Amino acid sequence: DRLAAGARALKRRAPEFPVRARCVVQRQNFADLPNAVATAHQLGLDQLSFLAADVSSSAFNRPLPWDAERVAEVALSRDEVSAFEEIVERLIVESAADFASGFIAESPEKLRRLPRYYRAINGDGDYPETICNAPWVSTVVEADGTVRPCFFHGALGNLHEQPLESILNSADAIDFRRRLDVRRDPICRKCVCTLQLGARAAAP
């Protein structure tokens, strides 16, 4: 109810302002993808995006990566992945207009990456290929001033100690970007939140 009230309030105040939502798909809600799309329409949202749950990193304020028990609470089992694949294929057919209009942010092929990701967690196949240039076109600044090349990789510095420009152009930061191969890096290969923005700059 609070989410619906907030979305309505935004639309009343600025009807032209786009209101987008992201649904993290995990064990408790993977069967509800069609309901998520219907609810997004009911709320008057402009777009809905789906994302797999990150179960392998120490990002998002986790002091340590999750243990196997915690991962199993969130990630899909083998049987659930099979059911999820069917749900995704059905959604692609039944919500074709939402894919075509961009209301569902992901393309059908990109949405199919989600069950592939959970299959890989269960040891059944490879993770979807990573295509990402986040460390070259963006940065993450945390509440305490920590600067990271993305949500998942280690810190490059802190705004309370150096200006952002100095951090991003430091020898360590340049070397990190120069050496990073997103298709082979173990952190990148399991990433659920890739970014591909514009043409990658020539600078390291």
Question: At which residue positions do the language-model features occur?
Answer:
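Radical SAM enzyme [4Fe-4S]-AdoMet core and its adjacent flexible, acidic
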Residues: 1-148, 154-159
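Flexible mid-to-C-terminal extensions adjoining Fe-S/redox cofactors in radical SAM and related proteins
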Residues: 124-133, 140-204
